[in-house]
């Protein structure tokens, strides 16, 4: 049980990659808290089925007060978070010239600014405990590009910069911070919103000739959250089947 006794906070854990991460950490022994604007009942049920302890509440992570309140609730229910995974995301396709300022701001606020609020809330306890694992879910689009997604790519690039910069500040306290950059991943949401031929086109560009799954990303996150990954920090791991290899 790789994460036995640890408390993990996962944003965006009600579905998709976030749900797979929450369930993987739970199966490997962590107590899992899920922060999401959507109902997390399905994920909590999956955690219970696997014998894992979970807690979830609606939380708009773009609002500092809601983040602070949620982290306080997690501390009272499960203990202070030792693992933070930021997976919540605003993602849509829109050409830059058609993008409204409100859409731009919402994307930046949820995808990257919310990480500021989360870190402010969890870092004091991590530093006091001299241990922590922080993982931001970025995107391979920062490396390979994607049409009509400049707003999204910008927000994910900011997370990569945060990881690179903050690693030096938190490292002396036994805390690592890394990013995982998924390639195109087959989720229910992606299936519902993206054309099927896009998946085939991306597979053709990959070294590994299959669609990526949420479980692929969860496996990388689980490793980075473990004791074994204690000497890895400030890094962005591309989990994209080799599409973005350099």
Task: Show which residues each predicted segment covers.
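Short C-terminal tail/terminal secondary-structure segment
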Residues: 144, 222, 233-246
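Alpha-helical segment proximal to the catalytic Tyr-Lys
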Residues: 124, 168-169, 230
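Conserved glycine-rich cofactor-binding loop
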Residues: 7, 14-15
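Residue(s) in the substrate-gating loop at a strand-loop-helix junction
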Residues: 139
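Short, small/polar-rich loop/turn modules that mediate ligand/substrate recognition or access, typified
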Residues: 171, 176, 232-234
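Active-site helix of classical SDR
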Residues: 119, 155, 163
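Substrate-binding pocket helix/loop in short-chain dehydrogenase/reductase
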Residues: 95-96, 103-105, 190, 202
